Amino acid sequence: MTQLNDLPLQTLQFYATAPYPCSYLPDRQARSQVATPSHLIQSDVYSDLVARGFRRSGMFTYRPYCDGCQACTPLRVLAGEFRPDRSQRRAWKQHSILQTRVLRLCYEPEHYQLYLHYQRARHSGGGMDHDSIDQYTQFLLQSRVNSRLVEFRDPAPDGETGTLRMVSILDVLDDGLSAVYTFYDPDPDCSYGTFNVLWQIEQARTLGLAHVYLGYWIAESAKMNYKSRFHPHELRVHGEWQRGT
């Protein structure tokens, strides 16, 4: 098996952060292993890192490195073999009318306002519900890899712009797509989050890419449960990708 000191990763250095409060499991401390320097993490290197369980937040490339805890498990959907279940088919039917536009990373006030609306409705008190424009930009709009911003809007007559319902940031890798972050209209009667994953799976198939990386799945975290509902998928356990159940 290749190691972190093999090409092309031997040019990178890895360090562990100090402990900080875990965002997902209460009363636990987390640590991250961070890859540096960021200017050397271009698309090919980043693809290799993601396949080894890393992901990014802005220019920060990391993976969990917690003391005595391995709850965060990287998960990727096998796009070519994916078959939706009944609820996923409903979500696709409900929202397939949305019109998409794929863009380079860019700041738009409309995107930022939807981001704040989403954070305040879904993650109130979590800190991100008061993110400044600079914080939003650093989190989502800074990248050295092959990243895209996707708008999802209601259909509108010619010459008009439909209501913005969802924005997704994704990275295009050598072997798949990596879901960086998605925010959307928090209407409880809609299934925008599920539809977004389905859309990314369909895009991966169209591009001939094998995987959609959904980040980390935590069995004990209710907010992470949705990831394991996309079958078939693989989990990275003890350094190896294994088929999930």
UniProtKB/Swiss-Prot annotation:
Q: Name one GO biological process term.
A: ubiquitin-dependent protein catabolic process via the N-end rule pathway
Q: Where is this protein chiefly located?
A: cytoplasm
Query: In its keyword annotation, does this UniProt entry include Cytoplasm?
Result: yes
**EC number(s) reported in the record:** 2.3.2.29
Q: Which GO terms describe its cellular component?
A: cytoplasm
Reactions mediated catalytically = N-terminal L-glutamyl-[protein] + L-leucyl-tRNA(Leu) = N-terminal L-leucyl-L-glutamyl-[protein] + tRNA(Leu) + H(+); N-terminal L-aspartyl-[protein] + L-leucyl-tRNA(Leu) = N-terminal L-leucyl-L-aspartyl-[protein] + tRNA(Leu) + H(+)
Family matches, as Pfam families: ATE_C, ATE_N
Q: What is this protein called?
A: Aspartate/glutamate leucyltransferase
Protein family membership? Belongs to the R-transferase family. Bpt subfamily.
Say what the protein does.
Functions in the N-end rule pathway of protein degradation where it conjugates Leu from its aminoacyl-tRNA to the N-termini of proteins containing an N-terminal aspartate or glutamate.
Broad EC category: transferase
Question: Which key words are in the record?
Answer: Acyltransferase, Cytoplasm, Transferase
According to the entry, what is the taxonomic lineage of the organism? Bacteria, Pseudomonadati, Pseudomonadota, Betaproteobacteria, Burkholderiales
The GO terms this record gives for MF are:
arginyl-tRNA--protein transferase activity; leucyl-tRNA--protein transferase activity
